[in-house]
Amino acid sequence: MDSPPKLTGETLIVHHIPLVHCQVPDRQCCGGAGGGGGGTRANPFCPPELGLTQPDHDLGQADSLLYPSLHSAPGAPTGSSDSVKSRSRDGRGPGAPKRHNPFLVQEGVGETGLGDLHDSSTGDSVTQQSFHLHSASQPFHLSSFQLPPSGPGQGRPWGATHSRPGVVEGQEQDPATALGTQCSTSHCCRPELEAERMELDECGGHGGSGSGGGTSDISGFSFEQEWKISSDESPRHPGRSGSGTQHCHCSSTSSQSEAADQSMGYVSDSSCNSSDGVLVTFSTLYNKMHSSSRANLNSVPQSCSDSSFCSHADPGAFYLDLQPSPAESRMSCESHHPENGDREEGCGCPHVSSPELDANCNAYHPHSEPCPAVADLTACFQSQARLVVATQNYYKLVTCDLSSQSSPSPAGSSITSCSEEHTKISPPPGPCPDPDPNQPSEYYLFQKPDIQPEEQEAVGSPAEAATAMGPTVLEGQVYTNTSPPNLNTGRQRSRSYDRSLERSPPVRLGSLERMLSCPVRLSEGPAALAGPASPPRRVTSFAELAKGRKKAAGSGSPPLRASVGDSSQEFSPIQEAQQDRAAPLDEGTRCSHSLPSLPLGPSLDLLGPEPWSTPVCQGSQSSEMPLPSLRAAGQGPLAQLMDPGPAFSGSPATSHTQRDSRARADGGGTESRPVLRYSKEQRPTTLPIQPFVFQHHFPKQLAKARALHSLSQLYSLSGCSRAQQPAPLVISTAQGPAPAPSGEPQPFTSQASGRGARNAGPEPETSRPSPLGSYSPVRSAGPFGSSTDSSASTSCSPPPEQGTAADSVSPWSHTCPPTVRPATSQQPPKEDQKIPTLAEYRLHGTGSLPPLGSWRSGFTRAESLVRGGGEGSMANRPNNANHLSPQALKWREYRRKNPLGPPGLSGSLDRRPPEARLARRNPIFEFPGSFGTTSHLNCRLNGQISKPLSLTCPDLQDPFSLTEKPPAEFCLSPDGNSEAISIDILQKKGLVKAVNTAVDLIVAHFGTSRDPGVKAKLGNSSVSPNVGHLVLKYLCPAVQAVLEDGLKAFVLDVIIGQRKNMPWSVVEASTQLGPSTKVLHGLYNKVSQFPELTSHTMRFNAFILGLLNIRSLEFWFNHLYNHEDIIQTHYQPWGFLRAAHTVCPGLFEELLLLLQPLALLPFSLDLLFQHRLLQSGRQQRQHKELLRVSQDLLLSAHSTLQLARSRGQEGPGDMDRVAPGERVKGVGASEGGEEDEEDAEEVAVVAGSSDHGKWARGGQAGWWYQLMQSSQVYIDGTAEGSRFPRSSSSSSGSGSEKKKGVGSGGPSQAPPPPPREGVVEGAEACPAPEEALGQERGWPFWMGSPPDSVLAELRRSREREGPVAPPTENEEGTAEPSPGGIKWGHLFGSRKSQREARPTNRLPSDWLSLDKSVFQLVAQTMGARREPEPRENLQESHPPAVPSKPPCEVQALCHHLATGPGQLSFHKGDILRVLGPARGDWLRCSRGPDTGLVPLAYVTLPPTPSSPPGSSQN
């Protein structure tokens, strides 16, 4: 903190807030930090333990109370600002206890005043674990409070913004830098700016006094106070503590572009350096301030001070105004701090009422904000929101040589020092230090008037916002991202941030949800946050930044705005921020623009009217009122909910006058302003979720994306257009004060009136799509999702309920924690007043918010969607898409479009827990006064601040989900949801998802190698058939499903009348010869000429293969899409391709995006691939069939022979019993294959015929057996494993055939038979015996050893079999075959009897190859049992064994006289004992004592198996 001296000029802390951070939540945090209500919230930049001590908290509350007066008097005397500033420097107010330095590691160490902090920043910094930049003493707070008029961050919970949970440290740093630059630009100047700056300070002072008020003097940061507050808030709202100060700075610092960067970079910690500047998290800031020169915000700003840094922040960063003089910074901190104190006392939202922060994070006093309590509440809520985003908040420190200006905010400015995690826990507001009254509240890059338009035009530029809205109501919006992606920064951040805060555990919503949380409504925190932060714009100069912002917001802005649009719903604050930027013109306006401050919670409450309510509450419109409520909610989502009054201090009923003051400062015109946040076109095109990617390049990408009109952007644009009609206010807001009047402008205009020029100025920024918008729940009337949409809807034709109550409340709910909403309910009158505005605001800013609950309950989700919320959301989302990576973009767009279904459905589809919770909470927070508005706001605020709250509100299920789903719907059918046709968006999304899956698989197939040569081979279906299989199995069906969706059954043909319609008909129609279809036509002709392609489906698939070869699949789809005549002719209105022109253009864009990668792959597919595949398949089947038939014949013959043989051998009883079973099995196996065999085996097991079956049923053995059996499915590859289970069941199961199991098992197992090709594994005879043995001796390697019980059972079965088998196996070789004859062995001829090895391995081909008849084979097998040659001695030696093998006997079929030497003569019916096979067709047999050769054809198996072995007659 000792680096403040380093700041020769103003240090702008640019708060880069990921989409989430861009939202008001940061400010909320700030408010939370500042507000007593925020006590529970953890300091986003420092752990709760770093939070303020109770004294600090009290002081903060007192300050907050004092600050409300300042807040009400944005143009507070410079003198008071100076006094405050000096106090800030001193770090001690008259009675201000020292605040813990939020940047300090130790909690309570930072009790010293800012001055002390500064003086002992190095030493005390460590002691000041809490980033208490300001003295804890209330007087100090008061001073700080006074200062806010001078300081941009005077009352705004900018710290909250600073510490947006969604923003990464680096991001935060960037925003800090940007803020610094911005502040330096705007700091000098006007009282109004000063007031705005005060507001910033308020944000910072309250929530992040250190960040804002203390910014000027690093050692005298208001951080101490801020952090104290943060610490106090921290318990309640982890993200709120220290958010007050930070709010100011964070919000101001983070521009939307910056936010996008932060979103991308939030991943990295404080060390993250953005191209434009150093991204510093609160922790980093703290460390630097204490130990390193850069530790100070001032020092950091110095290092990062450069226009580029600011410009970088412009997209997603807020520029914190760092006052040059520590005293000033302290004063500003104190001025913030008093507000913080008030907030702490009054729900930590009094801060809301404190000076609002302009887009540049400069706090300006909302002219009509008398309610410090509101600010406190807002701060609390914001703190919570920021808690979520805090971890992702990065602060850019920019040092501007505005020494004449109030000293730059101390390093303590929350933006700079907020760490993402800390921010999330208790985002210390990064209020711009309240400069001395003489010092300008804000630094304007441009003259205040210029900045106003710029800000209005481009909320994206925090600097612009700050400049334009300098003293105006930038508090809620301070964090508003200037870059369209930063929509998240503004509103998004507040909502999602608040929601995140409520979920503060997920400090870093690196996840999409978190991004939505911030950028989207509070409930949608992650999505919203992600959007704005992701694509931070990097502009070298503020002017450039502002221009870029303007472009993003006003013109090409829709993509950017779309991103912001996401925010937009959540980003009403953005609009407010823009308004805030316009603050120089009209604080009220600014307040409106500050809608993002909603996430600020307290800032929203106090500044909420400015940032959130500002549009809703700040102006005379009810919108402003809700904003404070929202802000309160944002600041202390839960805590605020606990004290709705403080939460909604903005409302007259609320005790927090700051919020009211802020609303009043907004001129009470917040109502008109709330919805004006941004026009559809200005909504962020990029997807709010992207920010989590933290690709700082996205800002540039974003610009490119806008230029390119990425699919998502296009989608968002269409959605915006539709939304725009419903929400002209939003559009105007985005465009600027002038645009605001365009439709939605009216509500905002009212706000503008209330806020004055400020509203107009910042409105464009608000209009600019905020990350929130895209991701905010679309199903809520689209205020967020389709902020423009909602706005327009509200302004133009929002359903009264939804438009006013729902929309108004929704944005706040999204942005602010539930507390704010309760505040809203507290001030039903105000809400009523601002409800119209709020509804408008919600429509355009919280359009998707309406789905949140309360008002949602009042209005159907569809209604909300119809209002344009959905569309707005969608539009916003597409904008955010620009920030997304191509894949993310693709998915975002897909999601946006997919939500095309009913609003409710859409919400459900994309439902994110946060939003759902918010929706549920909505009812919880519904209050009699403004059930819709307040409830919704509360829900939203809480949702963003804390996901639990969002969970509570079913309608606010998830900002992202709501935004995603409804936007597609809304965008597609902004004019009343073409849903009249009842289009199933989910089903449409499923079609696109199928294509996505196919493309992913194909791309993965090619991704196996990077070598072009290898890739070419991978794409060649003849070399790598897999690619062809993937295309045929996945891509072709997916594409066909798309083309078949909604396909008419018949098409009218001039000649034949009705003609059946099918995808191929569409191909025909779309490939008619034309200037651009020569290639397609040629392909069509080629495919049509293949006679092999016999069906339309085959032709269609071949056509797809050809399109892949010529890399024209995407082109063909686009061509088809462009020919609406073809589509109308062939498709129903609800068909995918028809709906792509109406309800879900985004889905089609997503489809095209998904198909794009295929144009880059080297396909060389055979158009007849499918035909050849089918042909080969047929051939294989035929071959198998033939094989099976021949096998069956052989098996049947052999089984018959062997059955008789085995019967004869085993004896009537045993043989009969076993042989039939075996034979049946064998036949079954041969015919039915493995299944039959297994079935037979199972039967055997069940019958208990097999020991295996018995023990398999037993406990231990049972489980092992089951495991063994079930495992074979996975180990089919292993012959042993698969055979084992089967054989065990068949062998042991054939257990009845004990002999085979045991006797043959042994020999056959020795040489495991190789699996046979033609036979099913189970059909192999060998395996069975092997199995028996295998069980005992070797189980499959994968199985481990069988249980002892199994082994014992096996032994017993063997012993049992042994007795039987031994007789049969006098020679194992011969006996085995006959007993089990191995069940398969006997079927196939020779089992083990021939040779152990051979029988085991014997394949059908083996014996088929033997050129012998079946009988010959049978005889051979029988004889082979005695492998020994038919030697007589062997025969004689065998005779003893012969009886044991009855099967070796044959019966003479006729009389035969030996005609040659060695032949045997016999009579018909004689029983001959087979001694073995002889040559050719002869058997060596014995008849009594005589032996000789017998023609095989003359003998057959004895009819009676029981015939005695030796009964052969001579």
Swiss-Prot record:
Biased composition (Acidic residues): 1232-1242
Pfam families attached to this UniProt entry: RUN, SH3_2
InterPro entries: Run_dom, Run_dom_sf, RUN_RUSC2, RUSC1_2, SH3-like_dom_sf, SH3_domain
Keywords of this entry: Cell membrane, Cytoplasm, Membrane, Phosphoprotein, SH3 domain
Modified residues (Phosphoserine): 534, 541, 557, 651, 776, 1378
Domain SH3 span(s) in chain numbering: 1445-1504
Composition bias, Gly residues: 205-215
Keyword set includes S-adenosyl-L-methionine: no
Gene3D superfamilies in the cross-refs: 1.20.58.900, SH3 Domains
A single GO cellular-component term on record: cytosol
Primary location: cytoplasm
Biased composition regions of type Polar residues, renumbered to the chain: 122-147, 478-491, 565-577
Top-rank taxon, per record: Eukaryota
Comp. bias regions, Basic and acidic residues: 1214-1225, 1353-1362, 1424-1435
Bias kind Pro residues: ranges: 426-438
UniProt subcellular location: Cytoplasm, Cytosol; Cell membrane
Region of interest (Disordered), residue spans: 67-184, 201-220, 228-254, 402-444, 476-510, 547-603, 642-683, 732-832, 1204-1255, 1279-1405, 1423-1446
Domain named RUN: residues: 1026-1170
Subunit text: Associated component of the adapter-like complex 4 (AP-4). Interacts with active RAB1A and RAB1B, and with GOLGA2. Interacts (via RUN domain) with RAB35 (GTP-bound form); the interaction recruits RUSC2 to the plasma membrane.
Protein name, UniProt field: AP-4 complex accessory subunit RUSC2
Species: Mus musculus (Mouse)
Gene name per UniProt: Rusc2
